[in-house]
Amino acid sequence: IGDLHRGVPELRADSRYNRDTALVTSKFSIGVDILTVIAETKPEGCVDFEVMTAIDDFSWQMSNLEGVQSTIDLAGVARQLNAGWNEGSPKWRVLARNPSVLTQSVTYIPTTTGLLNSDCSVIPIMIFSKDHKAETLARIVAEVKRIEASPGHPDVKFRLATGNAGVMAATNEAVAAAQFPMLLWVFGAVAALCLL
Protein backbone atom coordinates (compact mmCIF):
# COMPACT_ATOMS: atom_id res chain seq x y z
CA ILE A 1 0.00 0.00 0.00
CA GLY A 2 1.42 3.36 -0.97
CA ASP A 3 4.71 4.23 -2.60
CA LEU A 4 7.84 2.22 -1.96
CA HIS A 5 10.42 4.58 -3.45
CA ARG A 6 11.26 8.26 -3.40
CA GLY A 7 10.08 10.46 -6.23
CA VAL A 8 7.00 10.33 -8.39
CA PRO A 9 6.25 6.70 -9.27
CA GLU A 10 4.75 7.61 -12.65
CA LEU A 11 8.17 8.82 -13.79
CA ARG A 12 11.44 6.97 -14.08
CA ALA A 13 13.76 7.14 -11.09
CA ASP A 14 16.29 9.15 -13.11
CA SER A 15 13.72 11.58 -14.56
CA ARG A 16 14.48 15.28 -14.32
CA TYR A 17 11.66 15.90 -11.82
CA ASN A 18 12.74 13.09 -9.49
CA ARG A 19 16.38 14.22 -9.62
CA ASP A 20 15.34 17.82 -8.88
CA THR A 21 13.15 16.66 -5.99
CA ALA A 22 16.04 14.68 -4.50
CA LEU A 23 18.31 17.72 -4.82
CA VAL A 24 15.81 20.06 -3.13
CA THR A 25 15.23 17.71 -0.18
CA SER A 26 18.96 17.05 0.28
CA LYS A 27 20.09 20.70 0.12
CA PHE A 28 17.22 22.59 1.77
CA SER A 29 15.13 22.22 4.92
CA ILE A 30 11.90 22.01 2.94
CA GLY A 31 10.66 19.33 0.62
CA VAL A 32 8.03 18.82 -2.03
CA ASP A 33 5.88 16.45 0.02
CA ILE A 34 3.79 18.46 2.47
CA LEU A 35 1.26 17.28 5.01
CA THR A 36 -0.56 20.14 6.70
CA VAL A 37 -2.20 19.61 10.07
CA ILE A 38 -4.92 22.12 10.93
CA ALA A 39 -4.97 23.48 14.49
CA GLU A 40 -8.51 24.62 15.30
CA THR A 41 -8.75 27.05 18.18
CA LYS A 42 -10.83 29.92 19.49
CA PRO A 43 -10.94 33.25 17.62
CA GLU A 44 -7.82 35.34 18.26
CA GLY A 45 -5.99 32.18 19.36
CA CYS A 46 -2.78 33.46 17.80
CA VAL A 47 -2.40 36.06 20.56
CA ASP A 48 -3.01 33.55 23.37
CA PHE A 49 0.29 32.34 24.83
CA GLU A 50 -1.10 28.94 25.90
CA VAL A 51 -2.59 28.22 22.47
CA MET A 52 0.59 29.25 20.66
CA THR A 53 2.69 27.17 23.07
CA ALA A 54 0.54 24.09 22.35
CA ILE A 55 1.03 24.64 18.61
CA ASP A 56 4.77 25.22 19.07
CA ASP A 57 5.10 22.03 21.15
CA PHE A 58 3.19 20.05 18.51
CA SER A 59 5.44 21.42 15.78
CA TRP A 60 8.56 20.58 17.80
CA GLN A 61 7.38 16.99 18.35
CA MET A 62 6.64 16.58 14.66
CA SER A 63 9.96 18.09 13.54
CA ASN A 64 11.82 15.54 15.68
CA LEU A 65 9.99 12.60 14.11
CA GLU A 66 11.91 10.31 11.77
CA GLY A 67 10.98 11.07 8.17
CA VAL A 68 10.13 14.74 8.78
CA GLN A 69 12.36 17.23 6.97
CA SER A 70 11.05 20.35 8.73
CA THR A 71 7.93 22.13 9.94
CA ILE A 72 6.63 25.66 9.47
CA ASP A 73 3.95 27.16 11.69
CA LEU A 74 2.76 30.49 13.02
CA ALA A 75 4.32 29.97 16.46
CA GLY A 76 7.78 29.43 14.97
CA VAL A 77 7.45 32.48 12.74
CA ALA A 78 6.21 34.55 15.70
CA ARG A 79 9.30 33.52 17.69
CA GLN A 80 11.55 34.64 14.81
CA LEU A 81 9.71 37.96 14.51
CA ASN A 82 9.90 38.54 18.27
CA ALA A 83 13.68 38.23 18.03
CA GLY A 84 13.63 40.58 15.04
CA TRP A 85 11.78 43.22 17.04
CA ASN A 86 14.54 42.96 19.67
CA GLU A 87 17.64 43.59 17.54
CA GLY A 88 17.77 39.99 16.33
CA SER A 89 18.93 38.69 19.70
CA PRO A 90 18.57 34.89 19.99
CA LYS A 91 17.58 35.40 23.64
CA TRP A 92 14.30 36.89 22.39
CA ARG A 93 13.50 33.99 20.05
CA VAL A 94 10.63 32.95 22.30
CA LEU A 95 6.86 33.29 22.38
CA ALA A 96 5.90 36.37 24.35
CA ARG A 97 3.56 35.80 27.28
CA ASN A 98 2.12 39.29 26.98
CA PRO A 99 -0.74 39.34 24.41
CA SER A 100 0.26 42.83 23.23
CA VAL A 101 3.80 41.71 22.43
CA LEU A 102 2.50 38.51 20.81
CA THR A 103 0.14 40.67 18.73
CA GLN A 104 3.13 42.70 17.58
CA SER A 105 4.80 39.48 16.42
CA VAL A 106 1.86 38.18 14.37
CA THR A 107 0.31 41.44 13.10
CA TYR A 108 2.44 41.64 9.97
CA ILE A 109 1.89 38.01 8.92
CA PRO A 110 -0.74 38.10 6.15
CA THR A 111 -3.33 35.38 5.72
CA THR A 112 -1.92 34.76 2.24
CA THR A 113 1.05 32.99 3.85
CA GLY A 114 -1.28 30.13 4.76
CA LEU A 115 -0.19 30.32 8.41
CA LEU A 116 -3.49 31.67 9.78
CA ASN A 117 -6.99 32.69 8.79
CA SER A 118 -8.59 36.12 9.25
CA ASP A 119 -9.70 35.62 12.87
CA CYS A 120 -6.82 33.35 13.97
CA SER A 121 -9.14 30.43 14.70
CA VAL A 122 -7.36 28.14 12.22
CA ILE A 123 -3.57 27.82 12.35
CA PRO A 124 -2.03 25.30 9.92
CA ILE A 125 1.19 23.45 10.73
CA MET A 126 3.05 22.52 7.55
CA ILE A 127 5.04 19.30 7.85
CA PHE A 128 7.56 18.68 5.07
CA SER A 129 8.38 14.99 4.82
CA LYS A 130 11.65 13.64 3.42
CA ASP A 131 9.69 11.42 1.03
CA HIS A 132 6.18 10.12 0.49
CA LYS A 133 6.82 6.45 1.15
CA ALA A 134 3.90 4.68 2.79
CA GLU A 135 5.85 3.96 5.98
CA THR A 136 6.94 7.61 6.33
CA LEU A 137 3.40 8.92 5.92
CA ALA A 138 1.99 6.25 8.26
CA ARG A 139 4.55 7.23 10.92
CA ILE A 140 3.65 10.92 10.64
CA VAL A 141 -0.11 10.26 10.71
CA ALA A 142 0.23 7.88 13.67
CA GLU A 143 2.14 10.52 15.63
CA VAL A 144 -0.46 13.20 14.83
CA LYS A 145 -3.24 10.86 15.96
CA ARG A 146 -1.32 9.99 19.14
CA ILE A 147 -0.88 13.66 20.01
CA GLU A 148 -4.50 14.40 19.07
CA ALA A 149 -5.75 11.64 21.40
CA SER A 150 -3.59 12.72 24.35
CA PRO A 151 -4.94 15.34 26.73
CA GLY A 152 -3.61 18.68 25.58
CA HIS A 153 -4.78 22.25 25.62
CA PRO A 154 -8.61 22.35 25.69
CA ASP A 155 -8.79 25.19 23.15
CA VAL A 156 -6.60 23.50 20.49
CA LYS A 157 -7.68 20.57 18.33
CA PHE A 158 -5.33 19.15 15.70
CA ARG A 159 -7.02 17.88 12.53
CA LEU A 160 -5.57 15.81 9.71
CA ALA A 161 -4.68 16.85 6.92
CA THR A 162 -4.23 18.76 3.70
CA GLY A 163 -1.40 18.93 1.20
CA ASN A 164 -0.24 16.35 -1.30
CA ALA A 165 1.22 14.06 1.38
CA GLY A 166 -2.00 14.39 3.39
CA VAL A 167 -4.02 13.19 0.42
CA MET A 168 -1.58 10.31 -0.13
CA ALA A 169 -1.83 9.32 3.55
CA ALA A 170 -5.65 9.35 3.41
CA THR A 171 -5.56 7.28 0.21
CA ASN A 172 -3.23 4.76 1.86
CA GLU A 173 -5.59 4.46 4.85
CA ALA A 174 -8.62 3.98 2.59
CA VAL A 175 -6.84 1.30 0.54
CA ALA A 176 -5.69 -0.48 3.71
CA ALA A 177 -9.25 -0.49 5.09
CA ALA A 178 -10.76 -1.78 1.83
CA GLN A 179 -8.02 -4.25 0.91
CA PHE A 180 -9.23 -7.40 2.70
CA PRO A 181 -12.99 -6.96 2.09
CA MET A 182 -12.25 -6.35 -1.60
CA LEU A 183 -10.07 -9.48 -1.78
CA LEU A 184 -12.84 -11.52 -0.14
CA TRP A 185 -15.36 -10.26 -2.70
CA VAL A 186 -13.01 -11.00 -5.61
CA PHE A 187 -12.15 -14.50 -4.40
CA GLY A 188 -15.81 -15.15 -3.57
CA ALA A 189 -16.87 -14.08 -7.07
CA VAL A 190 -14.16 -16.25 -8.66
CA ALA A 191 -15.21 -19.24 -6.53
CA ALA A 192 -18.88 -18.70 -7.41
CA LEU A 193 -18.05 -18.52 -11.12
CA CYS A 194 -15.96 -21.69 -10.87
CA LEU A 195 -18.92 -23.54 -9.34
CA LEU A 196 -21.20 -22.62 -12.23
Predicted segments with their positions:
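Extracytoplasmic
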Residues: 1-196
